[in-house]
Amino acid sequence: TKVGDQLIKHIVFWRLNESAYGNDKQTNAQTLKEKLLAMQGKVDGLLKVEVGFDFSNEKDSCEVVLYSEFTSKEALSRYQIHPDHEEIKKWLSEVRYERRVVDYEI
């Protein structure tokens, strides 16, 4: 699924608040997963969206991870400014208390 010589990977980790919007952490994690998976097919160059939940309960773990692949840095930029992605970010501002991201090229 690699296009040309570039494949961009965008990985984001979140730690979630115990509750937000009247929902518990697990409910908000599931809602986040649904919102992120719904981005598939909406952005040209977005190849893959995968969302997982941590089961380790390590003290340094995050509850939710997004793994996504893009055909180019430009495709990642289109994703970042897509209106649906902007809505997710706004929603997340109340749900998460920590975010870590890594973008890299292979």
Q: Across the structure, where does each feature detected by a protein language model lie?
A:
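Glycine-rich, flexible loop/turn motifs
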Residues: 51, 88, 100
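C-terminal structural segments of small proteins and small subunits
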Residues: 70-95
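Short S/T/G/P-rich N-terminal loop/turn motif that feeds into the first structured element of a domain
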Residues: 1-62, 71-78, 104-106
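Charge-dense polyanion-binding interfaces
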Residues: 93-106
